[in-house]
């Protein structure tokens, strides 16, 4: 008898969900926040297990669940297993926070289930010579834009690093203002846009790796500044791109070498990040063992649980306005007070860093709540961050959080499906969103797709596709049909 491991794994996943449901029922009867915490942890474990049943389409869900645990659940979990209790906040604060995360995870799962089972029976035809030629032209133009704008990307990061060398991290965060001409900023934004379009044309592994490597190397400067998130997100972005390409080109993109780099590099990176937690503040790690440093790193990432807790405690103190929306704030501000708003007479904010203006006049949740909680420390460069969960809950309540999470789950599946098709623009948009998506549990909801409404993005997209069209028309009879560069 041959054991069907796929079926066994499915039964393990089902059993995990059954345990989660029983724990949830137990919580209804005993009303214990410890039972609720264990229910939440089991729900995350079950959700992660479910992702591996169809990992080809659930890789985005998987990484998102992991970041939810890391940013929003790890701290109270570690507190409980180390101390046997959780008592930093009142019970109702923990209850709200755990339930909010549970509601979002259930919504994400339902969203994935609604769309992942629907297979697109319409098969894409083979690429015609014209299609291959056009994609090759897009590839060349987008690569040229990337290479032209990359030096400006580095220059702006180096300017930040030079400023940071002479001040503390928090002074840098509160006071830094670029002295470079504005056009350098505009050109630097094209790096990510052009990179995503270039990668969406599905170049070969060598050329893709070079471009991704340049992107990661650039973000090493962010790491030296003390800002870890861009560097970590660039690594996650590179991994998920390799994963998606490997699904249609099995064994080419992720082989023994790549797996070894991941299994060895991931723990080392976490230890380095843990060390940087202290180095950024000018402190040492003392006599911490490797395991203690590893656990400390995870614990410190869980500070975003405090956003849920403080959001619940201080929600009534948030600025009251005639119209207020945190969930879509970046888009609304771009239209009313950003580059687009300025064209129609809007007045931009005078400060881009922590300030009373952003704390009281903007609809940026992280700034509003940080000022309420920290006061003068916020103005000195400190902050508690934000979370898409608190933005949605503050604007729309638990029902809104649930419904928007369903839409997110649907969106995750749509994005991953775009990776397995030949639509360059759609895949490019997916890559742009993925570049910042996994920071959402400790950032804003709109941040990952905000660029899609900017003039810079659609301007450079138009330039790339228009130039590619001209090139295609000029050389369509002589170009190599393979379209490689």
Language model features: what each stretch is:
Residues 375, 380-485:
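Hydrophobic alpha-helical segments
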Residues 90-99, 170-186, 390-394:
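Short aromatic-rich membrane-water interface segments that cap or initiate transmembrane helices
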Residues 27-32, 112-284, 478-485:
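Membrane-embedded catalytic interface detector for glycan/lipid assembly enzymes
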Residues 97-107, 177-193, 307-315, 451-453:
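Hydrophobic alpha-helical transmembrane segments
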Residues 43-48, 189-202, 403-417:
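Hydrophobic, aromatic-rich transmembrane alpha-helices
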Residues 170-173, 273-408:
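Small-residue-enriched transmembrane helix-hairpin modules in multi-pass membrane proteins
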Residues 55-58, 197-210, 417-428:
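Membrane-interface helix-loop-helix junctions at transmembrane boundaries of multi-pass membrane enzymes
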Residues 1-126, 215, 234-279, 447-485:
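N-terminal "leader" segments that precede or initiate the main folded domain
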